Amino acid sequence: MDIKGQFWNDDDSEGDNESEEFLYGVQGSCAADLYRHPQLDADIEAVKEIYSENSVSIREYGTIDDVDLDLHINISFLDEEVSTAWKVLRTEPIVLRLRFSLSQYLDGPEPSIEVFQPSNKEGFGLGLQLKKILCMFTSQQWKHLSNDFLKTQQEKRHSWFKASGTIKKFRAGLSIFSPIPKSPSFPIIQDSMLKGKLGVPELRVGRLMNRSISCTMKNPKVEVFGYPPSPQAGLLCPQHVGLPPPARTSPLVSGHCKNIPTLEYGFLVQIMKYAEQRIPTLNEYCVVCDEQHVFQNGSMLKPAVCTRELCVFSFYTLGVMSGAAEEVATGAEVVDLQVAMCRAALESPRKSIIFEPYPSVVDPTDPKTLAFNPKKKNYERLQKALDSVMSIREMTQGSYLEIKKQMDKLDPLAHPLLQWIISSNRSHIVKLPLSRLKFMHTSHQFLLLSSPPAKEARFRTAKKLYGSTFAFHGSHIENWHSILRNGLVNASYTKLQLHGAAYGKGIYLSPISSISFGYSGMGKGQHRMPSKDELVQRYNRMNTIPQTRSIQSRFLQSRNLNCIALCEVITSKDLQKHGNIWVCPVSDHVCTRFFFVYEDGQVGDANINTQDPKIQKEIMRVIGTQVYTN
């Protein structure tokens, strides 16, 4: 037994070992000699009452005036694809460990804060970001907090905690602003404009609204794309739960996650509520300065650093950047694809337009300068470093440390550039297993999710109203370096436009594969779209020529690549259909789902029509059987 400290529980366990009882008694008497501030007790009880007994654990030290409080934040409300992309375990709470003065509590020194997941030892970059946020929040609150001030706030709450159960009736349906109940039947909407306007049934409908969510609600199992699961297989997403973060289009909503929760229930409940507000929107803010990202197409799925140089330097020292070794070990094919996209963009005649973002890479020999700086672009030096990045195939066949040493000898900027390529990707990409879309005729098939929680939720809301279907989007591989980091944007009438906009402004799609395959081959000086007959001939020729390598090849063998995306699109009146060319002017109504890559001029079947019931059934089969895990 640890003689230095004890866990403070309501009921002391009775052990049979006399010596153990003796040690516990000595330790308990030491702790009893230290004064424990009653406001601390009150705040702990508030956490237990509002959340659960298991939401807080306390470690008291017998000889020093310190106490550690572990606050457990339930994150099961995160979607499966979000938690996977963010590298967090949604089945395990995030723990906030705060160390206070036992006798002074809020009148004492500002508490230290640690953020962790017990089973997530490596690469918990999200915890570092959340720690910075909560440390900043606590520092601001500590300027005016005191035990006396909090006591007056807490006394307002005590009148509700009566033996007659008034608080239970209150929580059952009167207030939409109270902290999270233990087992609510509906989410808590915290927008002040909705106060008094919504009843309980409307609150349930609020699941579809752009609001943050209680971390303790019990959630039904819903698939990621809103489709019924295949009876023979599991869902793509075992649980889809929770509400999205605020929409950035509304000033009121966009600032919602930074609203300061009430102190009426104590400081511990306040910081838990603030953490719950911030977690779903971490991708919308710079991981260093906590300022909101500004992108043409809104935020992306993965958290990222902003472009400020100071933030870039801090980002490299903060430890939130993905380790290249880990990514190569767990997703080598995805890293291989990312490098290929970067190379295609860098070698394009249009690189000054489409190679965006340009890398921000700290010089390994001088950590105070940028070796690659967006303000001072040097494409030749960048090309030299990229040429020194060894093939991902080689990286998987030997010791990563040895391979890194070889790269460092070739070019000291090669490995830092590889790290940037991996960490700057803001989309979630997973190589599909053998249960892929067979009609696409390529082994290089990927699940591609780039929509942040807010956009995905807006998409689901629109889908419930208008329905959805699938369509192809063709774009040359040189464009995908930017798409993975900035999203699928409306390029019509902008410098990004390459093909014209004969049918108006919007994202161009087609249910017919031959049309999108034509667009996917355009770029790098090729500005004539092949006809359907040419594509069919090419497809037939590529499938009759003996293959020099297996179609099941794990890695890309060629630099001559074509690619095409399969997107889900809302079938509202906004979707303009001009025969087999569709234009969607609302970017929120298009979400990428799958991505396909072809080598050496290969193309898939040019006769595919996503509106064919057989094709739709095949898409549904893959969605139903594709289960990806951490």
Curated annotation (Swiss-Prot):
Give the EC number: 2.4.2.-
| GO aspect biological process, one term | protein auto-ADP-ribosylation
Concerning InterPro entries, the annotation shows: ARTD_PARP (IPR051838), Poly(ADP-ribose)pol_cat_dom (IPR012317)
Modified sites of kind ADP-ribosylcysteine = 237
Q: Which residues are reported to carry the modification ADP-ribosyl aspartic acid?
A: 600
The reaction(s) annotated as catalysed by this protein in its Swiss-Prot or TrEMBL entry are: L-aspartyl-[protein] + NAD(+) = 4-O-(ADP-D-ribosyl)-L-aspartyl-[protein] + nicotinamide; L-cysteinyl-[protein] + NAD(+) = S-(ADP-D-ribosyl)-L-cysteinyl-[protein] + nicotinamide + H(+)
Q: Which UniProt keywords apply?
A: ADP-ribosylation, Glycosyltransferase, NAD, Nucleotidyltransferase, Transferase
What is the recorded post-translational modification? Auto-mono-ADP-ribosylated.
Q: What enzyme class is recorded for this protein?
A: transferase
Every copy of the PARP catalytic domain together lies at 394-620
A molecular function annotated in GO for this UniProt entry is:
nucleotidyltransferase activity
Protein purpose: Mono-ADP-ribosyltransferase that mediates mono-ADP-ribosylation of target proteins.
Family assignment from sequence similarity: Belongs to the ARTD/PARP family.
Tell me what this protein is called: Protein mono-ADP-ribosyltransferase PARP6
Q: Which organism encodes this protein? A: Mus musculus (Mouse)
Q: What is the lineage of its organism?
A: Eukaryota, Metazoa, Chordata, Craniata, Vertebrata
Gene of this entry: Parp6
